[in-house]
Amino acid sequence: MDNGDRSGAGAGAVGSAGSLGLRVGQAVFSSASLLFMSVGVEFFSYTAFCFLVTIMGLVIPWSCTLAMIDVYSVFVGCPLRVPGVMVIVVVGDCALSIVSFAAACSSAAVIDLLLQLHGSHSSPTFCGRYQLSAMMAFLSWLLMAASATFNLWFVASRW
């Protein structure tokens, strides 16, 4: 499976340039989601928003750590191929993908409810920020799901 990647790994598997791009995107979108949600001090009033902040706070260090591993693997040319470590990465990616999707969906549902109430419980400025936060969370989830899929595919193809 040679796709022009120096590491010889799959297109988005840990240790490839594709994985580095996915991880950087995850960190950027998660940080943006956290920033947009944290700008409004009213988010503590809603459990779904607190859940989103917590999950995005977990995704950022996970993605940054794996991005550093990818940088090392891409530039040094020493890919991460230890099966036990790859299984941990796959399990972590899958778990964070599921909970980030749940957080994004629950936040979007609460935002929709707040907008249907015509802003009587929240100002339109905060609702706009919350919408941006949920959108960034969905984009982060999309990249996280892609990483989980690529890494699962890589692990399954090695055994």
UniProtKB/Swiss-Prot annotation:
Disulfide bonds: none
Cytoplasmic side: 1-6, 70-94, 156-159
Pfam family, one: CASP_dom
Primary localization class, coarse: membrane
Residues that span the membrane, as ranges: 7-29, 49-69, 95-117, 135-155
Membrane topology: Multi-pass membrane protein
Record-given protein name: CASP-like protein 5C1
Source species: Zea mays (Maize)
